[in-house]
Amino acid sequence: MTGEEAVVVTAVVAPKAGREEEQPPPPAGLGCGARGEPGRGPLEHGQQWKKFLYCEPHKRIKEVLEEERHIKRDECHIKNPAAVALEGIWSIKRNLPVGGLKPGLPSRNSLLPQAKYYSRHGGLRR
């Protein structure tokens, strides 16, 4: 194999009907009873071990699958992506003077636009 990892998986399968041959014992340490799993005893008579070879997919295929998984995850987490993106750029709370008006009759001068000066170093100034 060219740099890919392979794993040998063993499984127990029952033989087809009509076969009465003696099967070799399973490799040491791979049987269900050898691992000490609860509720599993040693192999019954007539069962045989089958080996399967697992090869990992190519690196590019794994990258594409991971990208798709991230895209799906991001779609689920962001409810309103436009509002989230816009909040970092422009916010009503930061950019407009809201509040500060006292209940009752406001003065006529407070309703007029106030002179504001913009400095790229200091932001908005009055």
Curated annotation (Swiss-Prot):
Region (Disordered): 13-45
UniProt-listed InterPro entries: C11orf97-like (IPR040429)
Broad class of the protein's primary localization: cytoplasm
Keywords: Cell projection, Cytoplasm, Cytoskeleton
Cellular component GO terms held in the UniProt record: ciliary basal body; ciliary base; cytoplasm
Superkingdom: Eukaryota
Subcellular location: Cytoplasm, Cytoskeleton, Cilium basal body
Protein name: Uncharacterized protein C11orf97
Name of the gene: C11orf97
